[in-house]
Swiss-Prot record:
It is found in: Cytoplasm. The keyword Disulfide bond does not apply. The gene is RGI2. This is Respiratory growth induced protein 2. The keyword Cytoplasm applies.
Length: 164
């Protein structure tokens, strides 16, 4: 199967229904995640989306020669180098790719927070924006843990009610 054939099938994901009845899309590939966001924007379904991405960042896979079994045990939230590279990846690539996917390159993510504990580091990014006369809030949560290089991303958009 060539790369073109793989791309033509659409994003690979699984759909989970949470206890509260919410439909949640889960991705394991960054490209599939971005493709899905772009599709939702084109379908005008962009203001009420909740999806999660669980993946190894590209810099980790590059160091391991694209073999997840060769990823070093030190690639986790206890490594200053890993945390620094992950933060750069998130700020310069992941958020930029999300902005491009939802067709909002001017999005700035002004609401930034970082929480550190012994077993994980969490970055939260948020911004209110408007697209096609619909106002909504974009929230991105990025989590890295102490037990591995796998990164969890929680992407959520919620419509903002107009003030009456």
């Amino acid at each position: 199967m060539t790369k073109k054939d793989k791309k033509a099938k659409g994003p690979k994901m699984s759909t989970i229904t949470t206890k509260s009845g919410e439909s949640l899309k889960v991705f394991e590939d960054l490209h599939d995640f971005e493709t899905y966001l772009k599709g939702e924007t084109e379908d005008q379904e962009f203001d009420h989306v909740h999806c999660q991405l669980k993946y190894y960042p590209p810099f980790v896979l590059h160091d391991a020669h694209d073999d997840p079994e060769k990823i070093k045990e030190t690639a986790n939230s206890h490594s200053k180098k890993f945390v620094r590279h992950l933060h750069q990846h998130v700020e310069k690539h992941l958020l930029k790719d999300i902005k491009t996917a939802i067709n909002k390159p001017e999005l700035k993510f002004h609401d930034k927070k970082k929480q550190e504990s012994f077993d994980r580091i969490v970055w939260n990014y948020g911004e209110e924006t408007e697209l096609n006369a619909k106002k909504f809030k974009v929230s991105v949560e990025v989590v890295c843990k102490h037990d591995g290089a796998m990164v969890d991303v929680d992407y959520r958009t919620e419509p903002l009610q107009p003030l009456i």
